[in-house]
């Protein structure tokens, strides 16, 4: 074979580019060795966000060669932690397991207390999404979906804030099914409003399946309804709202809209504008962790199952909800239902 100068030059250029890419990746990996990475947690101690953050941290340490510290900043339905993460340097040393649902809905309803635009966070991966389950005071009047749908007095639900996942799910459910409801906000955490339900101060609450299961398995609260099209894998005996009643098209729209938001789930994010090389590495190692059979087994054993989601898919859902696909009249209706209708 005869090598012409131009061919040799091209081969050298390609080889150089490959070497440079490898060197760049190695340099990014080396950057993390000995560094401190802060994984911000906005949930209360013992909450699902707290547990997921603490399970994820040692796996990230192993992959990055860094020390990963879970930094708790609870408050304001996790928006305190969201605001904090928003203003951190985009140097790859700060991440947060964020409440994607609440963050998107807060933007949708024009919450002016927010300093951030969720669509501009650096999306790393979805860590988990899970159906929400209505759990109730076991000595109360609600034993089935039928009991709830036929209630003559307001169903009383405890929660943290108006877009904390509990209140907004409740509001859209009550609006869809045309039942009287009263949402009491102001509890500091899910543990507090779950305790209120255990005491009978409210009829119940709505939590993601892993949190709901902890209360149901101990007999403190009873699961009556899954707010999704599919049953919970952790609470398989609890029926879904969809299988329990024939829904009108309008009712199905409200429940499906909330389900679409739910798919965003708990997402690992960084501050806006993260350096591409560090972002690529963080996305790579996070995907490796969340698809590793040993990691998945460990998470599941603690009833905190992981369900990896591609960052591009999550960004697509966010942009669809906050973009122009939702007519303005419908957006205003959603805002009214979430922010005003049941308080």
Regions found by a protein language model. Name each.
Residues 265-271:
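A short beta-strand structural signal in non-transmembrane regions
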Residues 26-265, 331-343:
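Conserved hydrophobic/amphipathic secondary-structure segments
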Residues 1-11:
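Bacterial N-terminal signal peptides that target proteins for export
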Residues 20-22:
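N-terminal signal peptide c-region/cleavage motif recognized by signal peptidases
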Residues 44-45, 271-275:
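Structural beta->alpha junctions
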Residues 14:
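A glycine-rich, hydrophobic loop/mini-helix early in the fold
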Residues 33-37, 276-343:
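An extracytoplasmic/periplasmic, membrane-proximal ligand-sensing/linker region
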């Amino acid at each position: 074979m005869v090598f012409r100068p131009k061919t040799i030059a091209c081969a050298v250029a390609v080889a150089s580019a490959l070497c440079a890419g490898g060197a760049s990746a190695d340099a990014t990996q080396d950057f993390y060795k000995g560094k401190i990475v802060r994984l911000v947690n906005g949930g209360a101690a013992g909450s699902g966000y707290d547990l997921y953050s603490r399970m994820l941290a040692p796996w990230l340490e192993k992959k990055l060669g860094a020390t990963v510290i879970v930094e708790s900043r609870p408050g304001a339905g996790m928006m305190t932690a969201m605001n904090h993460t928003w203003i951190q340097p985009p140097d790859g040393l700060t991440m947060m397991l964020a409440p994607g649902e609440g963050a998107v809905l807060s933007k949708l309803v024009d919450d002016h207390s927010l300093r951030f635009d969720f669509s501009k966070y650096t999306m790393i991966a979805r860590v988990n999404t899970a159906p929400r389950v209505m759990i109730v005071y076991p000595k109360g009047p609600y034993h089935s979906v039928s009991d709830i749908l036929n209630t003559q007095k307001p169903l009383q639900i405890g929660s943290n804030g108006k877009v904390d996942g509990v209140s907004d799910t409740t509001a859209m459910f009550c609006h869809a099914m045309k039942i009287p409801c009263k949402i009491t906000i102001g509890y500091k955490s899910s543990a507090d409003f779950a305790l209120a339900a255990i005491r009978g101060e409210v009829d119940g609450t709505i939590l993601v399946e892993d949190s709901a299961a902890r209360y149901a398995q101990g007999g403190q609260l009873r699961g009556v309804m899954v707010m999704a099209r599919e049953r919970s894998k952790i609470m398989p005996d609890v029926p879904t709202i969809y299988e329990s009643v024939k829904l009108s098209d309008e009712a199905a729209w409200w429940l499906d809209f909330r389900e679409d938001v739910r798919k965003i789930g708990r997402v690992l994010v960084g501050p806006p504008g993260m350096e591409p090389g560090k972002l690529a590495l963080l996305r790579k190692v996070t995907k490796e962790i969340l698809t590793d059979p040993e990691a998945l087994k460990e998470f599941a054993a603690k009833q905190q199952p992981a369900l990896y989601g591609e960052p591009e898919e999550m960004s697509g859902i966010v942009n669809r909800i906050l973009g122009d696909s939702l007519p303005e009249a419908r957006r205003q209706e959603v805002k009214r239902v979430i922010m005003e209708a049941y308080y």
